Amino acid sequence: MISLKGVSKSYKGITIFEDVNITFMPNKWNFIEGVNGSGKSVLLKLICGFSKPDTGIVTVDDYVIGQDCDFIQNAGICINSPDFFNNLSGMGNLLEIAKIKKIVTKNEIYQFCKLFGLEEDINKKYKYYSLGMKQKLRIIQAIMESPNILILDEPFDALDKQAKQIMQNYLNDFIKKENHYL
Protein backbone atom coordinates (compact mmCIF):
# COMPACT_ATOMS: atom_id res chain seq x y z
CA MET A 1 0.00 0.00 0.00
CA ILE A 2 1.13 3.54 -0.75
CA SER A 3 -0.15 6.17 1.66
CA LEU A 4 0.28 9.81 2.55
CA LYS A 5 -0.73 10.88 6.04
CA GLY A 6 -0.97 14.53 7.04
CA VAL A 7 1.29 15.56 4.16
CA SER A 8 1.81 19.26 3.54
CA LYS A 9 4.17 20.98 1.13
CA SER A 10 5.02 24.60 0.44
CA TYR A 11 7.45 26.22 -1.95
CA LYS A 12 8.99 29.66 -1.41
CA GLY A 13 6.41 30.43 1.25
CA ILE A 14 3.43 29.40 -0.87
CA THR A 15 1.38 26.43 0.34
CA ILE A 16 0.96 23.90 -2.46
CA PHE A 17 -1.22 21.54 -0.44
CA GLU A 18 -1.97 20.92 3.20
CA ASP A 19 -2.83 17.88 5.32
CA VAL A 20 -3.21 15.43 2.43
CA ASN A 21 -4.38 11.97 3.46
CA ILE A 22 -4.66 9.45 0.66
CA THR A 23 -4.12 5.73 0.15
CA PHE A 24 -3.36 4.05 -3.16
CA MET A 25 -4.35 0.41 -3.43
CA PRO A 26 -2.62 -2.25 -5.53
CA ASN A 27 -4.17 -3.72 -8.66
CA LYS A 28 -6.27 -0.64 -9.37
CA TRP A 29 -6.01 2.41 -11.54
CA ASN A 30 -5.03 5.20 -9.14
CA PHE A 31 -5.34 8.77 -10.42
CA ILE A 32 -4.48 12.18 -9.10
CA GLU A 33 -6.62 14.80 -10.79
CA GLY A 34 -6.52 18.56 -10.54
CA VAL A 35 -6.12 21.76 -12.48
CA ASN A 36 -2.76 22.88 -13.83
CA GLY A 37 -0.51 24.06 -11.02
CA SER A 38 -2.46 22.31 -8.27
CA GLY A 39 0.52 20.23 -7.10
CA LYS A 40 -0.09 16.85 -8.76
CA SER A 41 3.51 16.49 -9.93
CA VAL A 42 4.80 17.67 -6.55
CA LEU A 43 2.70 14.97 -4.86
CA LEU A 44 4.19 12.32 -7.16
CA LYS A 45 7.71 13.57 -6.39
CA LEU A 46 6.97 13.22 -2.66
CA ILE A 47 5.87 9.61 -3.18
CA CYS A 48 9.10 8.91 -5.07
CA GLY A 49 11.30 10.59 -2.48
CA PHE A 50 12.54 13.26 -4.91
CA SER A 51 11.18 15.89 -2.53
CA LYS A 52 10.41 15.84 1.18
CA PRO A 53 7.10 16.89 2.75
CA ASP A 54 7.08 19.81 5.18
CA THR A 55 4.86 17.73 7.47
CA GLY A 56 3.42 14.23 7.41
CA ILE A 57 4.71 10.88 6.21
CA VAL A 58 4.76 8.97 2.94
CA THR A 59 4.83 5.18 3.21
CA VAL A 60 5.30 2.61 0.49
CA ASP A 61 4.88 -1.03 1.49
CA ASP A 62 5.48 -0.14 5.17
CA TYR A 63 8.68 1.82 4.42
CA VAL A 64 8.64 5.50 5.34
CA ILE A 65 10.16 7.46 2.47
CA GLY A 66 12.95 9.66 3.78
CA GLN A 67 13.30 7.58 6.95
CA ASP A 68 13.51 3.86 6.17
CA CYS A 69 14.68 4.54 2.62
CA ASP A 70 15.49 7.71 0.70
CA PHE A 71 13.62 6.79 -2.46
CA ILE A 72 10.77 4.53 -3.51
CA GLN A 73 11.99 1.03 -4.37
CA ASN A 74 11.12 -1.14 -7.39
CA ALA A 75 9.35 1.68 -9.19
CA GLY A 76 9.24 2.83 -12.77
CA ILE A 77 8.99 6.60 -12.79
CA CYS A 78 8.12 9.07 -15.53
CA ILE A 79 7.66 12.53 -14.05
CA ASN A 80 8.17 15.86 -15.80
CA SER A 81 10.06 14.71 -18.84
CA PRO A 82 13.32 13.22 -17.62
CA ASP A 83 16.24 14.53 -19.61
CA PHE A 84 18.20 12.21 -21.79
CA PHE A 85 21.57 12.74 -23.41
CA ASN A 86 20.97 14.53 -26.72
CA ASN A 87 24.02 13.07 -28.43
CA LEU A 88 23.26 9.47 -27.51
CA SER A 89 20.79 7.36 -29.41
CA GLY A 90 17.55 6.30 -27.78
CA MET A 91 19.05 2.86 -27.20
CA GLY A 92 22.26 4.41 -25.87
CA ASN A 93 20.26 6.37 -23.31
CA LEU A 94 18.28 3.31 -22.22
CA LEU A 95 21.45 1.22 -21.93
CA GLU A 96 23.03 3.89 -19.71
CA ILE A 97 20.02 3.71 -17.39
CA ALA A 98 20.08 -0.10 -17.50
CA LYS A 99 23.69 -0.09 -16.22
CA ILE A 100 22.50 1.15 -12.82
CA LYS A 101 20.59 -1.96 -11.74
CA LYS A 102 21.88 -4.40 -14.36
CA ILE A 103 18.61 -6.33 -14.49
CA VAL A 104 17.50 -5.74 -18.08
CA THR A 105 19.28 -6.77 -21.27
CA LYS A 106 19.65 -4.93 -24.55
CA ASN A 107 17.34 -7.48 -26.18
CA GLU A 108 14.66 -6.93 -23.53
CA ILE A 109 14.93 -3.17 -24.04
CA TYR A 110 14.60 -3.69 -27.78
CA GLN A 111 11.40 -5.69 -27.25
CA PHE A 112 9.86 -2.72 -25.41
CA CYS A 113 11.00 -0.44 -28.24
CA LYS A 114 9.34 -2.78 -30.70
CA LEU A 115 6.14 -2.85 -28.62
CA PHE A 116 5.91 0.95 -28.77
CA GLY A 117 6.93 1.20 -32.44
CA LEU A 118 10.28 2.80 -31.73
CA GLU A 119 12.52 0.04 -33.08
CA GLU A 120 13.26 1.79 -36.40
CA ASP A 121 14.34 4.98 -34.64
CA ILE A 122 16.07 3.53 -31.60
CA ASN A 123 19.55 4.17 -33.03
CA LYS A 124 18.84 7.81 -33.93
CA LYS A 125 20.28 10.47 -31.66
CA TYR A 126 17.80 11.62 -29.04
CA LYS A 127 18.06 15.24 -30.16
CA TYR A 128 16.37 14.27 -33.45
CA TYR A 129 13.37 12.63 -31.76
CA SER A 130 9.89 14.09 -32.11
CA LEU A 131 7.87 14.80 -28.95
CA GLY A 132 5.98 11.52 -29.38
CA MET A 133 9.21 9.55 -29.78
CA LYS A 134 10.66 11.22 -26.67
CA GLN A 135 7.55 10.30 -24.69
CA LYS A 136 7.78 6.68 -25.86
CA LEU A 137 11.41 6.58 -24.69
CA ARG A 138 10.39 8.00 -21.29
CA ILE A 139 7.73 5.33 -20.95
CA ILE A 140 10.14 2.57 -21.97
CA GLN A 141 12.70 3.70 -19.36
CA ALA A 142 9.95 3.57 -16.71
CA ILE A 143 8.76 0.04 -17.56
CA MET A 144 11.86 -1.72 -18.90
CA GLU A 145 13.00 -3.14 -15.55
CA SER A 146 9.58 -4.65 -14.78
CA PRO A 147 8.82 -2.64 -11.64
CA ASN A 148 5.83 -3.42 -9.45
CA ILE A 149 5.04 0.29 -9.05
CA LEU A 150 4.54 2.72 -11.93
CA ILE A 151 4.40 6.43 -11.25
CA LEU A 152 3.51 8.24 -14.44
CA ASP A 153 2.88 11.95 -14.81
CA GLU A 154 0.74 12.57 -17.90
CA PRO A 155 1.96 9.42 -19.69
CA PHE A 156 -0.28 9.87 -22.73
CA ASP A 157 1.07 13.32 -23.65
CA ALA A 158 2.35 13.57 -27.24
CA LEU A 159 1.45 9.95 -28.05
CA ASP A 160 -0.43 9.16 -31.23
CA LYS A 161 -3.64 7.12 -31.16
CA GLN A 162 -1.86 3.80 -31.76
CA ALA A 163 0.75 4.41 -29.04
CA LYS A 164 -1.99 5.45 -26.59
CA GLN A 165 -3.79 2.17 -27.23
CA ILE A 166 -0.58 0.17 -26.75
CA MET A 167 0.06 2.03 -23.49
CA GLN A 168 -3.52 1.46 -22.32
CA ASN A 169 -3.22 -2.28 -23.02
CA TYR A 170 0.16 -2.48 -21.27
CA LEU A 171 -1.17 -0.69 -18.19
CA ASN A 172 -4.30 -2.86 -18.08
CA ASP A 173 -2.08 -5.96 -18.05
CA PHE A 174 0.27 -4.35 -15.51
CA ILE A 175 -2.40 -3.76 -12.84
CA LYS A 176 -3.65 -7.34 -13.09
CA LYS A 177 -0.35 -8.58 -11.64
CA GLU A 178 -0.29 -9.25 -7.91
CA ASN A 179 0.67 -6.25 -5.75
CA HIS A 180 1.25 -3.86 -8.64
CA TYR A 181 0.53 -0.16 -8.27
CA LEU A 182 -0.31 2.35 -10.96
Residue ranges and their predicted role:
Residues 2, 17-19:
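Conserved structural motif at the start of ABC-family nucleotide-binding domains
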Residues 48:
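Helix-to-loop junction immediately C-terminal to a conserved catalytic motif
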Residues 56-71:
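Conserved ABC transporter NBD signature motif
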Residues 81, 87-101:
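Q-loop/switch helix immediately C-terminal to the Walker
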Residues 144-148:
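A short, proline-enriched helix->beta-strand linker immediately N-terminal to the Walker B motif
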